[in-house]
Every structure is written in C-alpha cells, then in structure tokens.
Curated annotation (Swiss-Prot):
One of its GO terms (cellular component) is plasma membrane. It comes from the Bacteria. This is UPF0756 membrane protein YPO3057/y1423/YP_2679. It is found in: Cell membrane. Pfam families: DUF441 (PF04284). Keywords: Cell membrane, Membrane, Transmembrane, Transmembrane helix.
C-alpha cells in the first residue's frame, strides 16, 4: 500500500474543522484544493499561488461594492456617511482594517508558514467562540503588528 500523502491529510483535517465549525467557505475552498491536488489540475497550483489572493480580494471587493452599484445604498447615503460621527468612525475603522488586511497579504505572501496557523485559529474561533470567519487576512495583519513584519 502506498504511503499516505501528509499534505492531503492536513487538507482533510482542515476540511473536517471547516465542517465542524459550519464554515462552508473554508470547507469548500479546501475541498476544491484537494480536488485540484488529486487530479491533473495540480499543474495549476503555481497560477493559484500567484493570483489566488488577488482574485479573492477582487471578488470580495465586488461583493462589498455591489450594494452601491445596485443602488441598494444610494448616492445620498454614501455622501451622508461623511457627516455623521458614526459613519465617520466607520470610515476610520474601515481604513484601519483595510490597512491591516494589506499587511496580512504581505505577511502571508512572504511567510507562508503562518497561513496554516491563521486558518486553524480562524476555524477554531468560529467553532469554539461562535465567531465569524472574517478572515485570515485581518488575522495576519494583526500578527504582522505583533511580530513586526509588514
């Protein structure tokens, strides 16, 4: 019998954590990666590694901007957000979180060894503390502040 692929076992364990924490995004992402790994599609991994985060951020940005583009959030509401203190505070927090996310992308790109820990931590936070899987990017940004890397 051939030896089991340790990387595949890790991916399966992370998928199981995703299922246990009811985090379908993590579960589906890992299952897709498993499918790529065990099929001839594995030749696409260099492309996924190079462009995956960029495409993910693009899709996330589309999702965030969709209510403005669809008209669900009107132009007057957007303009009004610059004069109410809660909205101004929301803008400041949004800038800070975006900055942290940028640091997170940089850290994850330059130190991929932290990715597994961030993912496991995110999944455990969802599973054990009823958290929301807002993402390893922000967690990586916070980590970059702690360890002093950008």
């Amino acid at each position: 019998m051939a030896a089991l692929d340790p990387t595949l076992l890790i991916l399966l364990a992370l998928a199981a954590l995703g299922i246990l924490s009811h985090n379908m995004t993590v579960t589906l992402a890992i299952l897709i990666l498993i499918a790529i790994r065990i099929t001839p599609l594995n030749s696409f991994f260099p492309w996924v590694e190079k462009y995956g985060l960029t495409i993910g951020v693009l899709i996330l940005t589309i999702g965030v901007m969709a209510p403005i583009a669809s008209g669900k959030i009107s132009a007057s509401e957007v303009l009004h957000s610059f004069v109410q203190w809660k909205s101004i505070l929301a803008i400041v927090v949004g800038v800070a979180v975006s900055w942290l996310g940028g640091r997170g992308v940089s850290l994850m790109t330059h130190q991929p060894s932290v990715v597994a820990g961030l993912l496991v931590g995110t999944v455990l936070g969802v599973a054990l503390f009823k958290g929301v899987p807002v993402g390893p990017l922000i967690a990586a940004g916070l980590l970059s502040l702690v360890i002093g890397k950008s």
